Amino acid sequence: LPKLEGIIKLNNKEKIFIKLVQVYLLEKNYQETILTVEKYEKLGYGYSKEIYDAQSIAYFRLGQFEKSRKVYEKILSMEKDKGESYYMIAESYYNEKNYEGAKEYYKKAYASTNDEKIKKDSAYWLIRVEDLLLNKTEVLARIKSFREIYPNSDYEEDITYLVARIYEEGNERKNAINEYAKLYEMSSDIHVKDDMAKRITELYTEEKDIKNAYIWSNRVSEEAYKYLWQAYIMELEGKNSEAIKNYEKIVNDKSYGDSANYKLGTHYLGKSDYKKSRGYFEKVLEFETSLNSERAQYNIGITYEKEKDYLKAVSSFLKIKLLVEDSTLDDLILIKLGENYEKLNDSNKSYEYFKEYYTKYSGNKDYAYVTEKLLVNRIQVKNISEMKEYYNELLKINPAAAKQYAEYIK
């Protein structure tokens, strides 16, 4: 590199500038690439596509997309086939998440080039942009056209997956299954085949198509997944004892053990075997990443509540309240804390959590129940003003319940 710089100083050869910017670009030294192009321009050399390509790519990789586009506009004014420049402008808009801008320039790229690769790539990315713009009808129309023009393209797997996903999102399960099955047959990648077999298994399970759910679950290479999902299928058939055996086989599996333990905990909770149930829920919490951990912690609290160990129940529910930000169970937790503090005869704490629910969840189904709890609490502590507030609110949402307390509001 120093040698090249020296040569420039000696003879200012245009071709050396070109070589130098290409070397800087290869080394990911984007600032030097840009500075070298600026020197090239100051020396008055004429148009060089290689020089400006390097400059625009350097700006692009630095995330300076507007500057990158300005360079491509220079190239556009000099080039007969404008497809590549239009395509790169589209790419810059895409990376800015300006999908309307990207759409406009992918269209221009497709229409203004004889380069078959740029045409095909532009057509593909138009599909992806329409998908991001949520134009599902347009996506499917473009895919139909793309498949007619490029029947065996290297994009076919991606397109097939996209079609399947659109069908699935539209609740067209059978069409989605057909597309996922095509992708399963098409792909030679074991991970893709596994993912497709799993998705098809799950869709057939949702459809309660037991036979096909079993067939596709057996095509998955992961034994633990087979045990888990076939247990779900067995439950649909009412074969609960067989399902339990399957869950027990994978309680220590890193990927699916948390789900198996959660299902076992739920099973024994339903059987009122609270200690055994709690053991499985506690095991769920041992997994570093688990979608079931919050609900498992909640159910641990339920087991203690069922055993009338209200202090431990409160402790379990508080773990979620204090440690889980934006908990999806927040409304349930507030009710459980209110109820269990009530059973511990701590009326202040009970009131605190019922009040929080009352303030946050006025549209929820348990709002009337909580309002009544607050009314009873205020009657017990003889707080007349708040008593009237909750009575009047209860009168609006559950008049029959409110009338039981009319004698206190005189």
Where in the sequence are the language-model features?
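Acidic, polar-rich low-complexity tracts and alpha-helical solenoid repeat scaffolds
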Residues: 1-410
